[in-house]
């Protein structure tokens, strides 16, 4: 079964966007994955194609209606077990491990929020899993959905040149990725570390590991702390 991303949006013209170029675009053209874009307004029932209304209890902005989204979700042709996601700044953070889970499945249905948000009743009624790509607010969920889809597509079989490419990247082992270098050997007085040119694969691997650990401790102490919790040091015993 081909991995398929189904996207519900008020702006279908935004897609495929960046998903139509580079790795994701080539894989899409090669039918290694599929993209199904659905206009939420097609599920509206009035002549104005209304999809939102004012917030109950008052307040600024508009809220996407539960009944319209329910029709859009129910009309989507998603395989059994497909995750139902809502891109939302209040959702659980998207992690590389979650991306790997999504890439291993049939592909998600993704609701792209707009305005002030989505009626909570559709989230509860359809069991939408709210996903966030960061602690900031975008104009809508489309860009966030593209980021999620791109992260998943890269992990699909046949998309990247080498299977191990995805295994050495940032977050794959709870660490940020080590520094990368290529020719020329010297650039503005800065040279490639000698160990990377030594041909000693064990030493290269050790250097990369040490650099990844140092970067993670410096830039993402939260990741380092979580890693330490998940992988506590082994206790030495006398014997």
UniProtKB/Swiss-Prot annotation:
Subunit structure: Homodimer.
Top enzyme class: transferase
Higher taxonomy: Bacteria, Pseudomonadati, Pseudomonadota, Alphaproteobacteria, Hyphomicrobiales
Name this polypeptide is given: tRNA (guanine-N(1)-)-methyltransferase
Region (Disordered): 218-239
Reactions mediated catalytically: guanosine(37) in tRNA + S-adenosyl-L-methionine = N(1)-methylguanosine(37) in tRNA + S-adenosyl-L-homocysteine + H(+)
Species this chain originates from: Nitrobacter winogradskyi (strain ATCC 25391 / DSM 10237 / CIP 104748 / NCIMB 11846 / Nb-255)
Binding site for S-adenosyl-L-methionine: 113, 133-138
EC number: 2.1.1.228
Cellular component, GO, one term: cytosol
Gene that this sequence comes from: trmD
Pfam families: tRNA_m1G_MT
Family recorded in the similarity comment: Belongs to the RNA methyltransferase TrmD family.
One GO-annotated biological process of the protein: tRNA N1-guanine methylation
Job description of the protein: Specifically methylates guanosine-37 in various tRNAs.
């Amino acid at each position: 079964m081909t991995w398929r991303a189904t996207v519900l949006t008020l702006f279908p013209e935004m897609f495929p966007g960046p998903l139509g170029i580079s790795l994701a675009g080539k894989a899409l053209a090669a039918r290694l994955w599929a993209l199904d874009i659905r206009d939420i307004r097609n599920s509206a029932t009035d002549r104005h194609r209304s999809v939102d209304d004012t917030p109950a209890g008052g307040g600024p902005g508009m809220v996407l209606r539960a009944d319209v989204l329910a029709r859009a979700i129910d009309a989507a042709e998603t395989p059994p077990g497909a995750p139902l996601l809502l891109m939302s700044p209040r959702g659980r953070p998207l992690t590389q491990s979650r991306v790997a889970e999504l890439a291993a499945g049939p592909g998600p249905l993704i609701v792209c929020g707009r305005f002030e948000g989505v009626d909570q009743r559709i989230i509860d009624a359809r069991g939408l899993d709210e996903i966030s790509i960061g602690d900031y607010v975008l104009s809508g969920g489309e860009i966030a959905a593209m980021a999620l889809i791109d992260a998943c597509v890269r992990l699909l079989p046949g998309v990247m040149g080498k299977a191990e490419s995805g295994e050495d990247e940032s977050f794959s082992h709870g660490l940020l990725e080590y520094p990368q270098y290529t020719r020329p050997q010297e650039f503005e007085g800065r040279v490639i570390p000698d160990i990377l040119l030594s041909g000693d694969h064990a030493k290269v691997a050790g250097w990369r590991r040490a650099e990844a650990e140092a970067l993670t401790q410096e830039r993402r102490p939260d990741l380092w702390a979580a890693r330490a919790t998940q992988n506590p040091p082994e206790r030495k015993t006398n014997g």
